Amino acid sequence: GRVALLTGGRVKIGYQAGLKLLRAGAQLIVTTRFPRDSAARYAQEPDFGDWGHRLEVFGLDLRHTPSVEAFCHELMGKLPRLDFIINNACQTVRRPPEFYAHMMEGETAALHATPEHIRKLLGSYEGLRSYNMLPESRLPESRLPESRLAEGRLPEAVASAMQVAIGQDISETAGLTRSAELSQVPLLAEELLGQKHLFPEGRLDQDLQQVDLRGRNSWRLLMHEVPSVELLETQLVNAIAPFLINARLKPLMLRTEAGTEPSRDKHIVNVSAVEGQFYRRFKTTKHPHTNMAKAALNMMTRTSAADYYADGIHMNSVDTGWVTDEDPAHIATRKVAEHRFHPPLDIVDGAARIVDPIGRTLAVRARHCRPAVVDVGLLLQVDAALHALSCQLVPGQLRGVVRGPQGGDSADVRRQVGGERVRRDRKRGHKAVE
């Protein structure tokens, strides 16, 4: 009966975390910019029939703040309760429109062409989308910039996305109703030149994502090289959107059914990264915008966790560990060939870490509950064990959920901000789970 919200649940760590929650019995709402692709991925799981009825997928572009507000408003009216929020979605390396182009046909096709079992996962979203689009009418071409109207200059999907971005009447919820189309809006000069050769059709990686052959990406940029667009997008996705979701949905997390006591084991997990840690001794001079965004996320947790704990909501920042090599493809390939290099953890390890705060709480509660509910805690306790094992592989990073006086947050994020505060906590007897 627990209800969870997971942002960025389409691929990689988010997808694996979604599966863990569903298989543990949760009702799950997943957000992604590409809802039909996400629904199809979940539907292909062999045990989909066991939990598919508890999954809903919504399209949402977290770069579009008014749409994030609208989505939270929708959940406030739709859900009777909300137990867990996992702010997993992030932007580390910005991808141009061509990276996502191979999904656009499926995302924009007529809904009746989508298999029924996938349509069911999208039912609430498509209903909301249709309702919000009723007053809309296709914008006349005259609303597009004249320099873009030349035949052949923009693909149809891009032209449609440009109309969405420019149209004043529909822009307020474009990130909710047209989340996939917005990925096709060219925002940088080089994105207007055509880069299809860098994203060869049909070449996907192990996560079924488009292969990116660019010689340089965001991970290699110095401060003076970061475009304003990327700086703003990174802040919006990694820090602003989690702030809004946590703030706007707090009343929903506190909502209780008539005649029942408020639950004090609700959780918010803000998915962080080593880039956001101040105490780390070795830090490169690259990708400062990503470091800034994750540091801001950690400070939100550090500041607000005590306030939320007073209402029984445990807020933690959790580092997934080193899961992905973000270097450009040719550099990553060279490292494998010359040094047999692979990141020490995988997406399952990362997912185990971010569900760990939830799993530990339910495991403890299960010891005091009837046998009928013990299975939920035991199942997620396995994830906690995997998490503990993975932590031993990456010494020096944020490890485990540190049990502090504010429900797991206090010492946790103090460790990210500075070790001195953590040591004082330990002197008071607050034990860190290593």
Predicted feature locations:
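Canonical Rossmann dinucleotide-binding motif of NAD(H)/NADP(H)-dependent dehydrogenases/reductases
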Residues: G1-T32
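A conserved structural motif in NAD(P)-dependent oxidoreductases
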Residues: E338-A352, R365
